[in-house]
Amino acid sequence: MCKRGHIIAAHSHSHKVLTDISLEDVKYELSTNKDYLETIIGRPVETISIPNGSYSADVLKIVIDVGFQSIYTSKPSTKVETFHGKDLIGRYAIMHNTKADDVVKIISSATLRTWMRYRYEILKFARQALGQYYYKIRTTILRYFVKL
């Protein structure tokens, strides 16, 4: 994939929520994953997608210290922000079952993109308010609906 021009990005070693673990563990999660990927593909991995979209200024500092140049977040946005000179790039979630027509709607509808940003902010607030319980509640709800 890499030879065909795909960007190989890191995501963390074990997909932990980076804001829920110690900064020492954050560094381990990121550097271990980065080193592992670089060994496999034989070139630098300079891009990361933050697991679960959860980060803080301290986490971002470690991301940069580990050597990442571009940082993808889960924040729905068309704007590129910067943190200590590095790009923070938001994105819109396109899942395996997202239809092409829905992608076109996201691209062409500012109203839909605004709604998606509001949804993101509401869920972000819920994650912050519920802490580690957010993911447990979310998993329980998803399991219930998947069974239906």
Please give the residue ranges for each predicted region.
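C-terminal active-site subregion of NodB/CE4 polysaccharide deacetylases
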Residues: K3, D20-T47, G53-L148
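Histidine-centered catalytic micro-motifs
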Residues: I7-H15
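Conserved alpha/beta-hydrolase fold motif
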Residues: I8, T47-I48
